[in-house]
Swiss-Prot record:
Gene Ontology CC annotations of this record: cytosol; keratin filament
Classification lineage: Eukaryota, Metazoa, Chordata, Craniata, Vertebrata
Keyword field: Keratin, Repeat
Stated name of the protein: Keratin-associated protein 5-4
Family recorded in the similarity comment: Belongs to the KRTAP type 5 family.
Residues in Sequence repeats: 21-24, 27-30, 79-82, 89-92, 107-110, 117-120, 135-138, 145-148, 155-158, 173-176, 183-186, 193-196, 203-206, 213-216
Transmembrane segments: none
Biological function: In the hair cortex, hair keratin intermediate filaments are embedded in an interfilamentous matrix, consisting of hair keratin-associated protein (KRTAP), which are essential for the formation of a rigid and resistant hair shaft through their extensive disulfide bond cross-linking with abundant cysteine residues of hair keratins. The matrix proteins include the high-sulfur and high-glycine-tyrosine keratins.
Tissue-wise expression: Expressed during the active phases of the hair cycle in the medulla and the inner root sheath of the forming hair. Also expressed in the upper layers of the epidermis of skin.
Amino acid sequence: MTCCGCSGGCGSSCGGCGSSCCKPVCCCVPVCSCSSCGGCKGGCGSCGGCKGGCGSCGGCKGGCGSCGGCKGGCCQSSCCKPCCCQSSCCKPCCSSGCGSSCCQSSCCKPCCCQSSCCKPCCSSGCGSSCCQSSCCKPCCCQSSCCKPCCCQSSCCKPCCSSGCGSSCCQSSCCKPCCCQSSCCKPCCCQSSCCKPCCCQSSCCKPCCCQSSCCAPVCCQCKI
């Protein structure tokens, strides 16, 4: 049994540890090599012996043993939980390389701004209409990421994409996200006559511009 690399017994008063080791605090543990820490700082007992390159943190802070040594020099403020900024270490703040819109407050879960890391805000590269507040679910503005605020592919629910007629692209007019073919459901060119929702070619079913005159073609009456 050694005392932080110092030869000698491990008595109740640290029994022979030199000034370069942990003299005030007895640091006698089965395996303890404080050379990697540049000396025991704050008492090796608090972290069960210095482990794996604590120098990057400037000594063990809060117990490096929980993460097997500090990594990447991220032992600061309330950034880390155990003692690093990788994998699932961080909670409130993100590592570098994330967009300014994401790496803040309680934005991230693990520690990044990609894949399924972020919750409320989106990563860069999304349209201005999507990457805001509670717009996205995982962290993008494509596929099925966004809920209320985007107009692409199958992202949107309530709003329509551009290029639709003013009578269609509103409120809960569309289902997938367009005003063509069989995209729209409830809205019509006039009252509530159309089923799919547009007044072109084979758009309408039973609706009519007057009574029940239209079948395949909309807004033209059969005589």
